[in-house]
A protein has these predicted regions:
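Short glycine/serine/threonine-biased micro-segments
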Residues: 14, 25, 51, 112, ...
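Short, glycine/acidic-enriched loop or turn micro-motifs at the edges of active sites
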Residues: 16, 78, 117
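Alpha-helical membrane and juxtamembrane elements of multi-pass inner-membrane transport
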Residues: 18, 22, 53-56, 156, ...
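Conserved C-terminal guanine-recognition region of P-loop GTPase G domains, centered on the G4
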Residues: 28, 34-107
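Conserved catalytic-core segments of large NTP-driven translation/proteostasis enzymes
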Residues: 88, 95-179
Length: 179
């Protein structure tokens, strides 16, 4: 969908539940950038970034699949009553995680949000006057369009194969290089 004045985005939801890791891999393999969502709720970020945690697994997969640009969204700020301390704790743990998998933390914004109340998603939150950065949507404009190596031979990794009645076998993939 058309989200910002600068770019055209297609959003792919990759659920954080372990049962949907295959979907996350499929989505991430098609992505140029990502939003990694952590929780400001006490204890939830600890679980997510711990060994075996979903955020840890997702950060590793994003980096492995070539997603070089990410935003940390610190969600559930409403649960912590929009506490700056809760944000800072989750942010610190999130930045430590993404640094450990190879991201440069100076290029990773951490944005406090509430998906439940819509705080700081599109419009600045009045409940977080201590946060002076951009909203999540405005931060999308900071993503850079990655250069595509069109001068190289065609490389199209196949992600799935469908057998469609009346059509035949259809391969699904993404052109990584070439034209």
């Amino acid at each position: 969908s058309d989200l910002t004045p600068k770019y055209f985005f297609t959003l792919i939801d990759a659920p954080g539940h372990r049962d949907f890791v295959k979907n996350m891999i499929t989505g991430a393999s098609e992505a140029d950038c990502a939003v990694l969502v952590l929780s400001a709720k006490e204890g939830e970020t600890d679980t997510a970034v711990a060994p075996g945690g979903q955020a840890r697994e997702h950060a590793f997969l994003l980096k492995t699949l070539g997603v070089s640009q990410i935003i940390l969204a610190i969600n559930k700020m409403d649960d912590s009553k929009f506490s700056e301390d809760a944000y800072k704790i989750a942010k610190e743990k999130g930045l430590k995680l993404v640094k450990s998998v190879g991201y440069k933390i100076e290029n990773v914004p951490a944005i406090p949000v509430s998906g439940w109340t819509g705080e700081n998603l599109v419009k600045k939150s009045e409940n977080m006057p201590w946060y002076t950065g951009k909203t999540l949507l405005k931060s999308f404009d900071d993503f850079k369009v990655p250069e595509k190596p069109v001068g190289k031979p065609l490389r199209l990794p196949i992600q799935d194969v469908y057998s469609i009645t009346g059509v035949g076998t259809v391969l699904v993939g993404r052109v990584e290089t070439g034209t």
